[in-house]
C-alpha cells in the first residue's frame, strides 16, 4: 500500500487534510471509506498487471529465482530429444550428469550408455541417478548385472531408494525428475525418461507423445545444483567446483545442436520450480493454482494423469466462470488402468462447465505443459496427480516468454487435428454406462492415483 501512496502523493495529502477537517462524529466512517478506497485501488493495480508478472512475483515469494539470459529450444518429439541430447553428450569435455525416473533397458538406453562410455575414455566425468521404484515398475528394468557392466565402463550410476521388502512403504517420495546437465553449460528437462517407446511407441497405446526442452543460460546452474544435491543425498559425495557451473557464452562445440530461433533467444526469463517432499512440497501445486487463478484470457493445458485435486478443479471452474477460455487435452489411450477413467470423469465435468476438451487419439500424450494468456508456460516432469503434487521429487521450468509459449500453443493447435472434441453427444457415444460408473468410482480414489 505504501507504493500506492507514493504514486498518488498529492491526492493522498488532500485526503489527509480533509480528514482533519471532518467532524469527530463522522471521522470513523470516513476512515473506513478511505481504507476501502485504497484497497480497491490496490486490487485494481494488481489486476492491471499481466498474468506473467503476477506469476513471477508469486513464485519469487516461494523462493524461486528467475534469470533473463536464457535460450529455450523445444524438442517436440522423442526422436528430436534423443538426437539432440546424444549429439550434445558426444561433444562433452568435462562432465555429464543425468537424473531420471528410469532408464529402460532397451536400444535407446544401450546407445546412451555406449556414448557415455566413450566420453569416459576421453576423461569426461559421468554421473547418473535413477529411481528405485521407477526401475522396479519398469517392464524392462536395469538389473544388477546391467548396472555392474555400466560401472565397469567408468560410469558412476546409483539407484535412489532401491525397492526392498516390504516394498509397499517405498512407493512414496520417489525421484520423478528428468534432468541432464552437460559440462555445466547446457541442460535438458521435460517429460521423457530414457526409453525407445518415445520413438517406436508400444503395442498397448500406440505412439508415445512427449516433449523436452534444452536450456542455455543461468538456469543451467539451478538444474546443476538440483542434481548435485540429489547426488549427495544418494551417494554421500559432495561435488563442488567452478567447472560444474556455467560461464557464458555457450561453447562453440554445441553450435551443431538445434538452435532457439525465436526473437528472444538468449533473453528469455526462466525459473526452475523444484519440488522436494520435505522442503517445498506445495510449490508445484501452488504454481498451477496461481497460474489458473491469474489467467485473464486463455489457458491451454496438456497432462496425461489429469486426476486433479479439489482446489485445482475449483480454480478451473472459476476461470471458466470469469470468462477465461480453458482448453484441455488428454489422451484416449493410457499406460495404466483406472487413472484414465478418473481423467475422463474430470474433463467431462469441466466440459459441462464450459471448458473446451480435446481427446487425443493416435497414442498416449504424455506431455505435461500449461500455457497461460500467451505469456508464460511450463515444461517439466510434474503430472497433475497426487504423486507429483503431494509426494514425489519433481522439477518444472517456468518460461516467461510469449515466443516459446506460442510455439507450445501452435503444437496444441496441431494436435487438435489428431483429436476429437468432447461434447455431451460424443461422451454418450464413447463412454458406456459401465465406463461412466468406473470413472465416478475412480475419481473417489484420486488422492491415491
Briefly describe each language-model feature range.
Residues 1-51:
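Bacterial Sec-dependent N-terminal signal peptides
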Residues 8, 41, 45-449:
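Charged, low-complexity intrinsically disordered terminal segments
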Amino acid at each position: 500500500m505504501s507504493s500506492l501512496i507514493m504514486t498518488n502523493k498529492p491526492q493522498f495529502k488532500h485526503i489527509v487534510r480533509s480528514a482533519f477537517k471532518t467532524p469527530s462524529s463522522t471521522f470513523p466512517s470516513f476512515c473506513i471509506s478511505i481504507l476501502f478506497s485504497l484497497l480497491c485501488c490496490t486490487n485494481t493495480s494488481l489486476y492491471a498487471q499481466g498474468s506473467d508478472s503476477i506469476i513471477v512475483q508469486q513464485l519469487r515469494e516461494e523462493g524461486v529465482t528467475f534469470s533473463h539470459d536464457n535460450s529455450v529450444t523445444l524438442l517436440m518429439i522423442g526422436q528430436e530429444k534423443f538426437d539432440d541430447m546424444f549429439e550434445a553428450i558426444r561433444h562433452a569435455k568435462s562432465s555429464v550428469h543425468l537424473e531420471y525416473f528410469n532408464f529402460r533397458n532397451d536400444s535407446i538406453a544401450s546407445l546412451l550408455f555406449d556414448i557415455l562410455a566413450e566420453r569416459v575414455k576421453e576423461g569426461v566425468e559421468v554421473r547418473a541417478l535413477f529411481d528405485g521404484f521407477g526401475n522396479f515398475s519398469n517392464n524392462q528394468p536395469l538389473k544388477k548385472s546391467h548396472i555392474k557392466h555400466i560401472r565397469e565402463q567408468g560410469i558412476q550410476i546409483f539407484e535412489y531408494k532401491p525397492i526392498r521388502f516390504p516394498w509397499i512403504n517405498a512407493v512414496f517420495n520417489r525421484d520423478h525428475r528428468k534432468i541432464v546437465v552437460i559440462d555445466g553449460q547446457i541442460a535438458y528437462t521435460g517429460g521423457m525418461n530414457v526409453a525407445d517407446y518415445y520413438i517406436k511407441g508400444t503395442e498397448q497405446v500406440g505412439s508415445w507423445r512427449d516433449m523436452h526442452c534444452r536450456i542455455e543460460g543461468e538456469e543451467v546452474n539451478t538444474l546443476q545444483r538440483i542434481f548435485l544435491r540429489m547426488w549427495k543425498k544418494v551417494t554421500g559425495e559432495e561435488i563442488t567446483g567452478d567447472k560444474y557451473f556455467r560461464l557464458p557464452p555457450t561453447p562453440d562445440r554445441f553450435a551443431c545442436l538445434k538452435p532457439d530461433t525465436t526473437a528472444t533467444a538468449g533473453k528469455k526469463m526462466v525459473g526452475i520450480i523444484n519440488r522436494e517432499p520435505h522442503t517445498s512440497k506445495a510449490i508445484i501445486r501452488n504454481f498451477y493454482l496461481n497460474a489458473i487463478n491469474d489467467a485473464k484470457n486463455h489457458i491451454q493445458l496438456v497432462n496425461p494423469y489429469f486426476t486433479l485435486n479439489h482446489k485445482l478443479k475449483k480454480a478451473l471452474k472459476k476461470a471458466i466462470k470469469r470468462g477465461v477460455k480453458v482448453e484441455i487435452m488428454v489422451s484416449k489411450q493410457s499406460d495404466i488402468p483406472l487413472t484414465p477413467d478418473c481423467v475422463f470423469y474430470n474433463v467431462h465435468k469441466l466440459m459441462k462447465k464450459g471448458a473446451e476438451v480435446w481427446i487425443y487419439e493416435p497414442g498416449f500424450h504424455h506431455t505435461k505443459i500449461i500455457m497461460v494468456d500467451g505469456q508464460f508456460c511450463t515444461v517439466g516432469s510434474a503430472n497433475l496427480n497426487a504423486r507429483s503434487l503431494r509426494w514425489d521429487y519433481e522439477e518444472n521450468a517456468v518460461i516467461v516468454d510469449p515466443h516459446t509459449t506460442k510455439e507450445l500453443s501452435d503444437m496444441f493447435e496441431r494436435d487438435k487435428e489428431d483429436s476429437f472434441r468432447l461434447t455431451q453427444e460424443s461422451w454418450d457415444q464413447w463412454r458406456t454406462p459401465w465406463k461412466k460408473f468406473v470413472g465416478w468410482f475412480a475419481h473417489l480414489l484420486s488422492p491415491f492415483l
